[in-house]
Amino acid sequence: MIMRELKADACLNSHMGAMWETNRSVKENSSQSKKYSTQIECLSPGSACRHFRSFHYHEATEPLEAINQLQKLCHQWLRPEIHSKKHILEMLVLEHFLTILPKGTQNWVQKHHPQLAKQALVLVERLQREPGGTKNEVTAHELGEEAVLLRGTTVAPGFKWKPAELEPMERILEHIQILALSEHKSTKDWKMAPKLIWPESQSLLTFEDMAVYFSEEEWQLLGPLEKTLYNDVMQDIYETAISLGKQRTGKIMGIEMASSFSKEEKKLTTCKQELPKLMDLHGKGHTGEKPFKCQDCGKIFRVSSDLIKHQRIHTEEKLYKCQQCDRRFRWSSGLNKHFMTHQGINPYRCSWYGKSISYDTNLQTHQRIHTGEKPFKCHECGKIFIHKSNLIKYQRTHTGEQPYTCSICRRNFSRQLSLLRHQKLH
């Protein structure tokens, strides 16, 4: 009898142990599944698309799990709960259209990050009309100089940085040695420094002929002062390319300068003259010296080029003109970005909902809606705002400022909307 009970207990314990192991395995699988599901939900649409396309069968333990993961990734990418069928079809057509393009054309089009198949078509047709056909790099006029130079914000998928051989600061210094002006003054006597030869048969010197690029890893190695120095160097190169293009053709990429440049106005020095100036400029950055002062408002600057740009605010000078709509801009970067709106190109994209935006600053502001970030704070009461303009308007409740005046009865208002409502009474 006792032996029988012992055998029954052993059998029961064996079954209970097996059930315990099975239950623990199920819980672990469920926990892993929930963890993976949470990670999937956090992916941006662009990341989800890349995960969906790069998913491999061996990443799953069984066929059913592979199907489930593909369904989750595809759902996260296409978002059928918020996108219409027409929009989803457009996304699929655009993606496949980009994959069947020739490699060089594909890279060039993807750098503009089109959101619609029609936009991609316009880009391809535009590229085909240009001399030389397929390009491997995008010029500053096409992406905007900030997109080409820095892109410390979002880099569109497909964007590839040029390979680098030298250390970051060495390459900044090397590319200051760009142009050397010979004793003769004829156009064909302009010469490029070593590694940047300008063929005499070339009809237009472009920004790409002189630009220097960093990889994302190299950019992270630079300090704030070195990044500022790089911006100054690239701005000078950019304006030099524009001035040379103006002398030769009068137009660069459909953009016309409102004022002409001459060789006397844009003197190009030799590397021996330029390098000491560069090192002196770099040294001023460490000391915090700002020797250039605006006579109108007293603001000081580290480099003279920044002072010249700043003074346009006081003079209301707008040198850069759009040929298509005659709108003028103070800065070349503003014209470059504006030019993209005529082409239907919005290079910046919200990673949350895929919304296309033409300016990187607008993208940063838009994303605060998703992140909840409110960087602007009222020092009087501590209230915070997403937009600086809203803070300025709100601060008038503390200061009592009323900048808007009715031209009829001379009554003052703190908000423009209040003035417009009041004027309806007249």
From Swiss-Prot:
Q: What is its main location?
A: nucleus
Domain named SCAN box is located at 49-131
Q: Which GO terms describe its molecular function?
A: DNA-binding transcription factor activity, RNA polymerase II-specific; RNA polymerase II cis-regulatory region sequence-specific DNA binding; zinc ion binding
The terms describing its cellular component in GO are: nucleus
Q: Keyword set for this entry?
A: DNA-binding, Metal-binding, Nucleus, Repeat, Transcription, Transcription regulation, Zinc, Zinc-finger
**Where is it localised?**
Nucleus
* Any one Gene Ontology BP term: regulation of transcription by RNA polymerase II
Q: InterPro entries recorded for this chain? A: KRAB, KRAB_dom_sf, SCAN_dom, SCAN_sf, Znf_C2H2_sf, Znf_C2H2_type
Name all KRAB domain ranges. 205-289
Q: Where are the zinc fingers (C2H2-type)?
A: 292-314, 320-342, 348-370, 376-398, 404-426
Domain of life, per the record?
Answer: Eukaryota
**UniProt-listed Pfam families:** KRAB, SCAN, zf-C2H2
The record's family statement is: Belongs to the krueppel C2H2-type zinc-finger protein family.
Q: What does this protein do?
A: May be involved in transcriptional regulation.
Stated name of the protein: Putative zinc finger protein 75C
Q: Which gene encodes it?
A: ZNF75CP
